[in-house]
Amino acid sequence: VDAGPTADGSGRVRTLDALLPLLVEDDERRADRVVAQLLDPTAHGGPAGPTGVHRAEPVFDPDAYWRGPVWPQLAYLMVQAVAPRSPGAAEALVRTTVAGAWASGMAEYWNPDTGAGLGAIPQSWAGLALVLARQSTGGAFGDQPVDCG
């Protein structure tokens, strides 16, 4: 999925932002591969939201700034990209992102496995998780508990 003119430069590391072309992708096979990576716990999937860096990358570190934590603004954009193609996958991303935001104390970014808050706590863009919860088919999840695993 991560290829093209930057494959020999900064594009060598598989990152979540490199999957953002899904917002405008018209190749269904390619889109399906991206959605699968977002949910795969060996790729970008996590109980507290999608990882910023693919888990198989040597630089992946779930607690290191842009090396693997969940960033709510990227998770939000991925939900917007996935929703028209796969509502079930989008709902799964919403659930994990909301779980992470809640567990983190609405942090700037958080560990994708534990939801431990990183950076500024609270931070305004974590509020995007509340927007996702409100827009989801389950509403704001009613009385259902939020659990990172």
Task: Enumerate the predicted regions with their spans.
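Extended amphipathic alpha-helical segments enriched in small hydrophobics
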Residues: P69-S104
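Extended glycan-interaction surfaces of carbohydrate-active proteins
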Residues: V1-V70, T96-G149
